[in-house]
Amino acid sequence: MYGLYHTFNFITSYDHKDPSEKSIAWRLIVLESLAGVPGFVAAGYRHFHSLRTLQRDHGWIATLLEEAENERMHLIVCLEVAKASTLTRSMVIAVQMVMTPALFFLYIFHPKSMHRFVGYLEETACYTYVNVIRNIETPGTKLHTAWAHLPAPALAIGYWRLPADASWKDTLGCIMADETHHRYSYSYSSLKLFVNFVFVSAMSTIRSPI
């Protein structure tokens, strides 16, 4: 994971101390386009497993799909501010074509490893967003100049129910909060993966996903 992180930094020209608007925009688009893949792949596999074994899934599918959908919304919101170039779109397609089958087979043979990998991925995303917000708040940085007074997109205001005068920094704070929640994918790797999901057990008094 350490090697992947620094390779990703190199590809996206990421300067931790004073990143440029362009490098961060590219980084967020690529990061969020990939982050929505694992949850959907895992949910898809578990959907077929439930059909094949004629058994309930006990809430895993709905939880993983919600995570994937949330990551997709992060991407759509980021695209309201940053525009994806032809190179970026080509890179996303190429990586997705490799990543999707690789994660699918990983989930077949060792699902706990995939959940652990996603946990590390989300932890890395948290570090990225914390650093971006810190740079926006620091006068004299490139991101402060570009984004300090940028308003939040209408889509973000509606999705996170932000006030009408919310800023782009507020939006990034909401995305970071989501990533902080997603990093608990770590804990999924410690659970028995084909028994009652812990969330469903806690919600046994109300209707819950099956």
Task: Set out the residue ranges of the language-model regions.
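Non-heme di-metal
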Residues: 1-210
